[in-house]
Amino acid sequence: FNLVRMGSLLSGEARVLMDPHVVNVLPFLSMLMGNYLSTFGVLLLCTQYRALALRRQASQDPLTGLLNRRGFMERCVTAPKQGALVVLDLDDFKQINDRHGHEVGDRVLAAVGAYLAGQEDLVASRFGGEEFVLLLPEGDALAQQTRCEQIRQGIATLPLDGIQVTASLGLVPYARGWHLDTLFGQADRALYRAKRSGKNRVCLPA
């Protein structure tokens, strides 16, 4: 009896679902729930994208697209245990701004940033003004100095509408147990040596 009754109920439900004169709420509810979930998914995706964009904006230099100071410091947390820190400063950049205007100066900075961004073996950042900071991969001091010379020469030959741009670089190789503040102090001293020695060169700390 129960099986017969159950069959009758199921048969009756089937007839109701197939009756064109009867409003079936199940597809409507399903569509409504699907639209809700779809809208929620889009909103969640937009929220995640906005959060990612804000994080990127907080760690990226808007002019060059390189890491800014904050982004570089965050990257240093996962930096290799061995490598080299380089502080790069464009020589006499104030004269470029004074002579050609800040718009041209910005184009120079953007061009240098694009050049550094294209060097896939290093991490490049702009700390502000005409100062850039790089992380070179592991290697001996001679190889790292040679790499810095290549970077210096690459900047000196950038096509900048007749504007000659040179850079001085302070290089500090590091190994296990390095401390970032100490490295920056040594790199700044190396950069000062490069400036004092005539600019447009690579120097190690004294």
Segments the model singles out, each with a brief description of its role:
Residues 5-14, 18-62, 70-82:
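Signal-transducing coiled-coil linker helices
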Residues 55-74, 88-102, 110:
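Conserved nucleotide-binding and Mg2+-coordinating catalytic segments in signaling enzymes
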Residues 59, 113-143, 153:
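Conserved helix-loop-beta segment at the catalytic/binding core of cyclic-nucleotide signaling proteins
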Residues 72, 76, 86, 109, ...:
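Heptad-repeat coiled-coil signal-transmission/dimerization helices
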Residues 76-88, 99, 115-123, 157-161, ...:
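Nucleotide second-messenger and two-component phosphorelay signaling modules
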Residues 113-114, 143-161, 188:
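Alpha-helical scaffold within the catalytic cores of cyclic-nucleotide enzymes
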Residues 126, 155-174:
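Catalytic core regions of nucleotide second-messenger enzymes
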Residues 142-145, 172-206:
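Catalytic-core segments of nucleotide cyclases and related cyclic-nucleotide turnover enzymes
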